[in-house]
Amino acid sequence: MTEAAEEPAPPTIGVDLGATNVRGGVVDRSGSILAELRDHTGDDGADVIPTTAALVGRLRTDFPAVAAVGVGAAGLVDRDGDVQYAPNIPAFRRTPLREELGNAIGLPVVVDNDANAAAWGEIVHGAARGALYALMVTLGSGIGGGIVARGRVIRGAHGFAAEVGHFQIDPNGPMCACGEPGHWEAFASGHALGRMGREWAAAGRAPGVLARAGGDVEAVTGVHVGDSAQGGEADGRALLDEYAELVAVGLAGLANILDPERIVISGGLVELGDTLLAPVRAAFARRIEGSAYRPRIDIVPAALGEQAGVIGAAARARDLEPGESGVWTK
């Protein structure tokens, strides 16, 4: 008698919820995205839940067997799936996102911090796969983080761990978007690189970068700096090297505390490849304690790119047992 073939696990939907955009995808057990949609939300985030519910509904039209939905949301997400605070989404203040979205779509929903979701995606399907202890750092408009130890995302007592962009490295430094001065995010985010580019251009130190912005100092962004550095222009390279030092300051501090075996860097700046990562690795080696006497900590680019959050959130949803509420306990 031949045993019946085991039915494939139903797909899940992963949602990456940002300040002004929502992206969702149907993801199978292998981490492949079968369908993907995105939509815009209002600046204040008041329409995030109905917009997300509508997007999930459109995805389910072609994939009615979807079993659950995972959401990676910006901000402080607690164990109940409530977003307590999101600095870039004014409407997210003590918002019961898991409950309200679940009621709107009629499926089990699990909600996690967006950086944690991306970290989980890289652990399960990406560049951190096989690492027992890993640190995920996202260099975007801000800086996000995820910590993995022995195959589990570390969330802390309240779910707010790994807000790595918000440790202070200079109390007299530039103002962070959260309203406090001198946070690592204010020095080493993608927005910070753009600010550095404008400062250098205004001081006459970055003519190549300025030319790429059409000669308009206020138009200079991190993209112009990266293009200049990749083009071999001395000013772009020097500026990016200084930025790499600031990235390494934070990475070395985190590594001294957490002792990961691998650090995965994600975000748009990773597209610069070794133009950015080589000076980051060199500066990191100079700054971490006992560099010559400790095992090497690999610093690698993320493998999943901007899809890490969707894939990781879907993987979190796949871990839900039938009938489980979506409140995470590990």
Model regions: which residues?
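Active-site glycine-centered loops adjacent to acidic/histidine catalytic or metal-binding residues
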Residues: 114, 140, 313
